[in-house]
């Protein structure tokens, strides 16, 4: 038997699912790769005014080591125990 309330709720669920999938596709489609260079090279060209367009850049070199970092409740059962990491 046809129940309009059930049809309405399924319609809302289907619309919500469609909207969620479209939003997820939009977020995934705009994701990109972040790339950075260690050198600071910039210029403020054709900037009218005394304080407009001033560029100050400071290159920061921090060695980051992310291999083998885990969080465990019991440290003796750490799955990364014995791993060796090097900074290239």
UniProtKB/Swiss-Prot annotation:
Keyword terms:
Amyloid, Cell adhesion, Cell wall, Disulfide bond, Fimbrium, Secreted, Signal
What's the biotech application? The small chaplin mixture (a cell wall extract of an rdlA-rdlB knockout) forms a stable coat on a number of surfaces (including Teflon and cotton) and emulsifies oil-water mixtures, which could be useful in medical and technical applications.
Location comes to: Cell surface; Secreted, Cell wall; Fimbrium
- Which InterPro entries is this protein grouped with? ChpA-H
The chain's disulfide connectivity reads 67-85
Q: Per the database record, which ranges form the Chaplin domain?
A: 47-87
Asked if the Swiss-Prot or TrEMBL record annotates the protein with the keyword Transmembrane helix, the reply is no
Q: What is its main location?
A: other
In the UniProt record, the signal sequence range is: 1-36
One GO term under biological process is: cell adhesion
Q: Which GO terms describe its cellular component?
A: cell surface; extracellular region; pilus
Briefly explain the null phenotype: A strain deleted of chpF and chpG makes rodlets. Deletion of all 8 chaplin genes on minimal medium leads to severely disrupted aerial hyphae that collapse on the colony surface and are not hydrophobic. A few spore chains can still be made, but they have neither rodlets or amyloid-like fibers. rdlA and rdlB mRNA are down-regulated. Deletion of all 8 chaplin genes on rich medium leads to a reduced abundance of aerial hyphae without rodlets and occasional spore chains on surface hyphae.
Expression induction or repression: Not expressed while still submerged, accumulates during aerial hyphae formation on minimal medium, no transcript detected during sporulation. During aerial hyphae formation and early sporulation on rich medium, under control of ECF sigma factor BldN. Expression depends on bldB but not bldA, bldD or bldH (at protein level).
> What free text does the record give on domains?
The mature protein rapidly forms a predominantly amyloid fibril beta-sheet structure at pH 3.0 and 4.2, with less beta-sheet and more random coil at pH 10. Reduced and non-reduced peptide have the same secondary structures at all pH tested, suggesting the disulfide bond is not required for fibril formation.
Q: How does it assemble?
A: Homodimer; disulfide linked. About 20% of ChpF isolated from cell wall forms disulfide-bonded homodimers.
What function is annotated for this protein?
A: One of 8 partially redundant surface-active proteins required for efficient formation of aerial mycelium; the short chaplins assemble into a hydrophobic, amyloidal fibrillar surface layer that envelopes and protects aerial hyphae and spores, presumably anchored to the long chaplins. Chaplins have an overlapping function with the surface-active SapB peptide; chaplins are essential on minimal medium while on rich medium both chaplins and SapB are required for efficient aerial hyphae formation. Chaplins are also involved in cell attachment to a hydrophobic surface.
Q: Which family does it belong to?
A: Belongs to the chaplin family. Short chaplin subfamily.
Name listed for the protein in its UniProt record: Chaplin-F
